[in-house]
């Protein structure tokens, strides 16, 4: 059986562990920048310098990382490529 894939958690966790700066756009049009320090099912903690923002996920419209985020490991990607060749 295939492993369950949670895109949101994987994306946020990569941003958190890699400390990739992000821009977060809220549904009211407000924009904030920072590094994701932590997140749970309902909130995420964004840090910018010595300022912290606890943002409720239901208020988030878009998260834009400053660099590309690869959601699959190179091993997984190589496995896919070899499957496609067969």
UniProtKB/Swiss-Prot annotation:
GO function terms (MF aspect): RNA binding
Gene Ontology, cellular component aspect: cytosol
Keyword set, alphabetical order: RNA-binding, Stress response
Pfam families: Hfq
SUPFAM superfamilies: Sm-like ribonucleoproteins
Coiled coil spans: none
Residue intervals of the Sm domain: 9-69
BP term (GO), one: regulation of translation, ncRNA-mediated
Keyword Lipid biosynthesis recorded: no
SS bond partners: none
InterPro entries, per the entry: Hfq, LSM_dom_sf, Sm
Assembly behavior: Homohexamer.
Family in the record: Belongs to the Hfq family.
Main function: RNA chaperone that binds small regulatory RNA (sRNAs) and mRNAs to facilitate mRNA translational regulation in response to envelope stress, environmental stress and changes in metabolite concentrations. Also binds with high specificity to tRNAs.
Xref: HAMAP family: Hfq
Name the UniProt record assigns to this protein: RNA-binding protein Hfq
Organism: Thermosipho melanesiensis (strain DSM 12029 / CIP 104789 / BI429)
Gene that encodes it: hfq
């Amino acid at each position: 059986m295939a492993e369950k894939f949670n895109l949101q958690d994987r994306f946020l966790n990569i941003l958190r562990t890699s400390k990739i700066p992000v821009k977060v756009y809220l549904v009211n049009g407000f924009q904030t920048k920072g590094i994701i320090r932590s997140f749970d099912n309902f909130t995420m903690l964004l840090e910018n310098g010595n300022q912290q923002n606890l943002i409720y996920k239901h208020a988030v419209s878009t998260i834009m990382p400053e660099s590309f985020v690869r959601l699959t490991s190179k091993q997984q990607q190589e496995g896919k490529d070899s499957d496609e060749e067969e």
